[in-house]
Amino acid sequence: MPFSDADLIARVLAREDHNAFGELVRRHQSPVRAFLARMARGDAHLADDLAQETFLKAWKKLHTFRGNARFSTWLFGIAFNEFRDFVRRRKELALEDADNLPNEPATARDGLLRLDLTEALKRLSSNERAAVVLCCQNGLSHEEVSQVLDCPLGTVKTNILRGKDKLRRLLAPAYKNYESAGN
């Protein structure tokens, strides 16, 4: 029977068990990397670097994990903070708010209007994107997203609502073209 996250954390804290921490990394690296890739607008190398920093910080700060939330929620919080710190350090990656972008819903490719979810997510503000990805892709509750992003619950709900509304507007033309092509 596999150990729970709580059991593995206890083993790491009791005897600095590297194998136990390695198992925590194996369990959580894919969702953390996917979240960071979405936040980094698809830059896999940046996502990998930030994920590595996330797990290094988790190793160093594991003693601060209180168990009030799931381990994955705590880990996503570290990942989001790593991303936010990176953006602060590298102003050229500062993300524009989708409201400041042109109203063109998609780009033409091979004569067809297309906009996939990845491209649409890039057009959301970083706060909207983080809230939508954590809630819809990673399955966190609004309360957990509030903890991860360290913002009020109402702000999370607003960011999710606005993000979903923008995604609907951005993806509607692509979906109509997909449907009219007989798919």
Predicted regions and their residues:
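Residues within the DNA-recognition helix of helix-turn-helix
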Residues: 28, 159-162, 166
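Internal acidic/polar
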Residues: 2-7, 85, 91-119, 141, ...
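Arg/Lys-rich amphipathic alpha helix in sigma70-family domain 2
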Residues: 60-67, 77-97, 162
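C-terminal edge and immediately downstream basic/flexible tail or linker adjoining helix-turn-helix-like DNA-binding
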Residues: 42, 147-148, 165-183
